[in-house]
């Protein structure tokens, strides 16, 4: 297997395993247990200097040379370019894919991630303010997506890496206190993608130590 996915059972980790399954690329998972500080292991930091999961190592990279890639958006883009899948060849077709990929990376990820953070806080004063702020922003972003998906099956003109990027975070909607029934277009899109066999395999691959 040429690709090693260094990851854990999180939205950002799952969107890469989903993409790999959809692209039909062989890969193996190297679990990075972020609950035990595994992301700070020097070997992982050499791949992902931030250090956050996921990262990949492709032993058959460009010109046949090994390459490592960190940041989930960059990984999705790399895999799309490597395989010629889920990213249109023409610039005009690439624009909406990249727009919604950046929408996810820059907003729909950080906001629900903060919801999860404040839910876990024990200080009620800090929790109340932070949870109200980021829950409202998360719901606003869901509303943006819901409006965009009206009459559409995908975020761009066809299934793309933008869908995989968003899917990883919608997967955790209940944890972020979002009822998808409030956003019927997102719910329809989500249920359709989750019914795909490759997507199901991507969410089933073990990303925690037994």
Where are these regions (language model features)?
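Conserved histidine-centered catalytic loops in small-molecule metabolism enzymes
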Residues: 206-210
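GST-like fold's C-terminal all-alpha helical module
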Residues: 92, 101-197, 202
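GST-like domain detector, emphasizing the conserved glutathione-binding G-site
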Residues: 1-129, 146
């Amino acid at each position: 297997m040429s690709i090693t996915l260094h990851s854990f059972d999180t939205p950002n980790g799952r969107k890469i395993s989903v993409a790999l399954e959809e692209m039909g690329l062989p890969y193996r998972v190297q679990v990075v247990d972020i609950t035990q500080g595994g992301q700070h292991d020097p070997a992982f930091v050499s791949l992902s200097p931030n250090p956050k999961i996921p990262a990949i190592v492709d032993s058959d990279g460009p010109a046949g040379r090994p390459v490592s890639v960190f940041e989930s958006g960059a990984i999705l883009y790399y895999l799309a370019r490597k395989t010629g899948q889920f990213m249109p060849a023409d610039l005009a077709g690439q624009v909406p894919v990249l727009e919604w990929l950046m929408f996810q990376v820059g907003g729909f990820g950080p906001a629900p991630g903060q919801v999860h953070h404040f839910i876990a806080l024990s200080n009620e004063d800090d929790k109340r303010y932070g949870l109200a702020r980021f829950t409202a922003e998360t719901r606003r972003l869901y509303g943006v997506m819901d409006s965009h998906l009206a009459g559409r099956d995908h975020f761009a003109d066809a299934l793309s890496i933008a869908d995989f990027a968003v899917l990883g975070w919608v997967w955790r909607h209940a944890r972020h206190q979002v009822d998808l029934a409030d956003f019927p277009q997102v719910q329809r899109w989500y249920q359709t993608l989750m019914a795909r066999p490759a997507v199901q395999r991507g969410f089933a691959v073990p990303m925690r130590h037994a």
